[in-house]
A protein has these predicted regions:
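Internal "kinase-insert"/substrate-recognition segments embedded within catalytic cores
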Residues: 2-32, 48, 53, 62, ...
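C-terminal tail/sorting-segment detector
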Residues: 390-400
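Residue-level detector of functionally pivotal "anchor" positions at catalytic/ligand-binding pockets or at interdomain
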Residues: 352-381
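Accessory structured domains or lobes within enzymes
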Residues: 55-77, 197, 209, 213-218
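Phosphate/pyrophosphate-binding loops and the adjoining catalytic core of nucleotide-dependent enzymes
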Residues: 38, 42, 48
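Middle-to-C-terminal accessory/interaction subdomains
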Residues: 138, 142-195, 199-227, 231-358
Length: 400
């Protein structure tokens, strides 16, 4: 959505619903998300725990914020939409293009696009707004805006062509940012965001020297990954087929690691330091942002907003009479309950993958080692480990 002046001659920045002033906004129809909040909840989670590693005018936020609205177009009701800001130069504090010297400084790339037809080999559109870096690895150039050029693509090309070791990744990326992004994928099972699509890559100023003796200056040349389009999170599917207790994503945390993901994550998998960072970060976040209580609270906040305002019922009633309709559920409370059950199991799978000590202990009166005692997740002692599923042994949650 673009805001214009009254005579439509120019763009018009404006604050909407308490969000930062912009001329271009996102109106998300959430057409494949049956609860109309997955992207918003997942982005709220990201913003809560993963700030940019530098200061900005927006509290170092790298994800969008949004407000839910009921949409009317030419007096025709369209249901619930999410109005949100964009990931852009101002949000990420990227250095603006130098028009005087015609110099590219800050760059922002968006992964995944249909704007370029040939995605089998490296090529670019004539206006330099989109390009394919490698086989089925297409990007859009979002910054510099209005000054797209070949020079702006060189940093991305250089990363893919020449920075292929783990030491390179540590030098050219913020490892903690990569760890946070991978945990987001693992914890919320966001399979649609682990390949060559649905994320941003930004560099504050490509004119800076990555080898500068001043680490603050060198950091301005490092790349940041920001998430985008998270509507397959929390058990969701790309076609809206997961609902009513059935069909939710069963992509296990271990599968995320085995898959490897796209560059630069594919290079990090298997690195001891990186694995240790993932485990330590999960151990920290499982009691805060990713706790069952915290995730449930975010789901229930938007559930209550939709129900108490009457917006959900209005949307359900409206689309009952329409031939073309988005994916919806009539009973939102019931569906949120199913998703909370899904996340409770996902949380336990994350604990099992990382070998997190649950704090469950037993007292024995014989000489049998505690490590040989096996319990169900309900606390019942078992004679042997189950053939499949979760169980507790030696105070640790395990999985077969």
């Amino acid at each position: 959505m673009k805001l214009r002046t009254d005579d439509y001659s120019a763009s018009q920045d404006s604050m909407l619903l308490g969000m930062r002033s912009m001329s271009k906004w996102i109106l998300d129809a959430m057409a494949i998300d049956r609860i109309c909040m997955r992207n918003r909840v997942a982005m709220d989670i990201w913003n809560e725990y993963s700030p940019l590693p530098y200061q900005t005018n927006f509290n170092s936020r790298s994800g969008t914020i949004g407000r839910f609205v009921e949409m009317y177009i030419n007096n025709q009701y369209k249901g619930i939409y999410c109005l949100s800001d964009r990931i852009n130069r101002k949000l990420l504090n990227l250095k603006k293009y130098d028009e005087t010297n015609k110099l590219v400084r800050g760059v922002l790339y968006k992964s995944g696009t249909e704007d370029i037809a040939n995605q089998k080999e490296r090529n670019f559109t004539a206006d330099w707004k989109a390009g394919t870096i490698s086989w089925h690895n297409a990007w859009e150039l979002k910054e510099p805006e209005d000054f797209e050029c070949e020079e702006a693509w060189q940093p991305l090309i250089d990363l893919y062509d020449n920075k292929k070791s783990y030491s390179d990744i540590k030098k050219y990326f913020f490892i903690d940012n990569l760890v946070d992004y991978q945990l987001h994928i693992m914890a919320l099972s966001i399979g649609d965001n682990w390949g060559n699509k649905n994320h941003f890559l930004s560099i504050r100023n490509i004119q800076k020297n990555i080898d500068d003796a001043d680490s603050t200056e060198a950091a301005r040349r490092k790349a940041i990954i920001s998430p985008w389009d998270l509507d397959t999170s929390l058990g969701g599917k790309y076609n809206g087929s997961a609902y009513d207790g059935n069909g939710y994503s069963d992509w296990k945390p271990a599968d995320v690691v085995k898959n490897g993901g796209c560059y630069p994550f594919s290079i990090c998998q298997g690195q001891k330091e990186y694995k240790n960072k993932l485990k330590a970060r999960w151990a920290q976040l499982r009691t805060t942002t990713y706790s069952k209580e915290s995730v449930n609270a975010k789901l229930e906040k938007y559930r209550d907003l939709f129900l108490n305002s009457g917006a959900w019922q209005r949307m359900v009633d409206h689309y009952k009479t329409e031939s073309s309709k988005p994916c919806l559920v009539e009973d939102l409370t019931k569906e949120i309950g199913y998703i909370e059950e899904w996340y409770a199991k996902r949380f336990d799978l994350m604990d099992a993958y990382f070998g997190i000590d649950t704090g469950i202990a037993t007292t024995t009166t014989d000489n049998q080692s505690l490590n040989n005692d096996i319990y169900s997740i309900q606390g019942l002692k078992l004679n042997e480990a189950p053939a499949k599923g979760l169980y507790i042994q030696g105070g640790k949650l395990r999985m077969k």
